């Protein structure tokens, strides 16, 4: 089958919807529903999120250390299958340990959309003389949030329980996985030409600062993405509106990577990232300052408009250092991101139980994200 630029991007977007939207983001949407219908506690919800992030880190570790591109291609296909299976399997048990195992496997699958698929598409773009940007691909993150939010919201209108929600998400993933399976470009086929760009690895100091900045990003992302629905649900007058807030995040995230690609063309990657991180920190801290509807809307739009931009810009920059095998350094970078995601939900869960709200968790998260800018200014000095 001939792979065109359009088909490659569609495959990438569909891959993200399946492996990230359903296997990862949907859990955030279903936390309040599972707390009410399945007896999931606040602390357990944090531990399940951590299990999901641990799985993601495992998937990233595999991607970073797997050098055979053909194996990566086949692994991506396996992740598509497992994303469907783990979602459907959530309905057959209410055992917290089995849920943790399923969330771990689903997290591993999420690495397929963010790392392996990104690397395969970036390599195909470079090898076929297209612009080496992943903004369109990462628009899939926003689209995945929109699609899953609309599905959950529509099923809430019909009083569907948490089991029906998970099964509907599994069916959705199975359908959308088809173009991701058929059109993802194979690394040694589909008309790819010989790589003309040589690897241009950065210095060790540059790598270290980049990883520290991305670690801080992962912490901020983990707290908001996991608990944003529950944060909104706790606001008086916004009950049962959490999935709508998540929908706003998705709507903001869909064009964000494309917009920030254009910003980066004018300012460079690092200056664009400094701006994105600053706005991300503001978006994270706003709900702790005020819980009015307007502030919540601004917060969700800022978070949606920046979190995926940070991922897209960092991974594109990392991939461009190693055009022969982009996913390798992408994976190394994302290990730092994933480590923070594993850590973040646990203190957030304890802070929630101690204070009775998310305010302290959000203050801590915003502070850690602002540390990113300090590391990025260090990167500016390294790049001069």
List the predicted regions and their residue ranges.
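Extracytoplasmic gate region of multi-pass secondary transporters
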Residues: 28, 206-247, 251-255
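C-terminal transmembrane helical hairpin of 12-TM major facilitator-type secondary transporters
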Residues: 270-314
């Amino acid at each position: 089958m001939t792979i065109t630029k359009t088909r490659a991007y569609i495959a990438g977007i569909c891959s993200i919807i399946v492996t990230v939207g359903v296997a990862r983001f949907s859990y955030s949407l279903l936390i309040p529903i599972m707390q009410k219908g399945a007896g999931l506690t606040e602390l357990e919800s944090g531990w399940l999120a951590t299990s999901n992030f641990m799985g993601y880190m495992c998937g990233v570790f595999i991607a970073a250390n797997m050098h055979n591109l053909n194996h990566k291609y086949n692994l991506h296909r396996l992740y598509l299958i497992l994303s469907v299976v783990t979602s459907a399997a959530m309905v057959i048990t209410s055992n917290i340990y089995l849920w943790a195992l399923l969330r771990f496997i689903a997290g591993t699958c999420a690495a397929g959309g963010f790392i392996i698929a990104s690397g395969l598409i970036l390599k195909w773009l470079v090898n076929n003389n297209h612009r080496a940007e992943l903004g369109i691909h990462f628009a899939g993150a926003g689209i995945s949030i929109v699609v899953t939010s609309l599905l959950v919201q529509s099923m809430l209108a019909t009083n569907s329980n948490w089991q029906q929600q998970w099964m509907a998400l599994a069916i959705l993933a199975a359908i959308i996985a088809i173009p991701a399976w058929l059109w993802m470009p194979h690394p040694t086929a589909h008309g790819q030409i010989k790589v003309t760009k040589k690897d241009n690895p950065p210095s060790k100091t540059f790598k270290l600062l980049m990883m520290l900045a991305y670690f801080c990003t992962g912490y901020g992302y983990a707290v908001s993405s996991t608990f944003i629905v529950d944060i909104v649900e706790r606001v008086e007058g916004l009950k049962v509106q959490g999935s709508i807030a998540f929908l706003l995040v998705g709507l903001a995230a869909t064009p964000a990577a494309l917009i920030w690609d254009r910003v980066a063309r004018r300012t460079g990657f690092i200056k664009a990232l400094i701006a994105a991180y600053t706005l991300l920190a503001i978006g994270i801290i706003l709900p702790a300052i005020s819980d009015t509807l307007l502030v919540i809307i601004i917060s969700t739009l800022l978070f949606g408009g920046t979190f995926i931009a940070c991922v897209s810009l960092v991974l594109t920059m990392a991939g461009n250092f190693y055009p022969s095998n982009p996913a390798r350094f992408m994976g190394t970078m994302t290990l730092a991101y994933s480590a923070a995601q594993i850590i973040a939900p646990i203190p957030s869960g304890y802070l929630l139980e101690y204070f009775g709200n998310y305010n302290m968790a959000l203050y801590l998260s915003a502070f850690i994200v602002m540390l990113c800018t300090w590391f990025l200014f260090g990167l500016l000095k390294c790049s001069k």
